Amino acid sequence: MGLQKKLNYKKTESERSFYRGSNLKQVMGEDIVSKFDYIGPIRWIFLNYCTGYFIFVEELTNNSEIRSDRLEFIDTMNKIFSEAEQYFNSAPKERPKNPKSLAEYKYLGYYRLSFSNTNPDNSAIIRLNDVEVEKSELPPLLNLDTDEILDYAV
């Protein structure tokens, strides 16, 4: 309670892990959809409601690679959000805010999180955007309490 009061954070909604209801095809419109061989869900969206930082994460297991059609889609989504971020940097009054915490949303990028096996607990090698990291480094980076994850941006 002391930290929450000290940082002036307000209670936010509970996390929605495992919610997979992204309807990108409906949002994008047919003219945009027709330009892609592949449109699918963004695998993970990490959002810290208190800081407003958010990232997209593509999780890869067993040293797998991203299919080229999916990579094209991810690159395009990253470009759209990166350009929006640039716009909001030049027009800060327009930047959207979390309605409860009043934190300004800030897109910190797209990240590939890859495991040599199926998860951090059974993988000898863990990579964040091709940089090897320790399992213990993941929670502070992915909690997005700071923008430290930018050190791993591509």
From Swiss-Prot:
This is Uncharacterized protein AF_1407. It comes from Archaeoglobus fulgidus (strain ATCC 49558 / DSM 4304 / JCM 9628 / NBRC 100126 / VC-16).
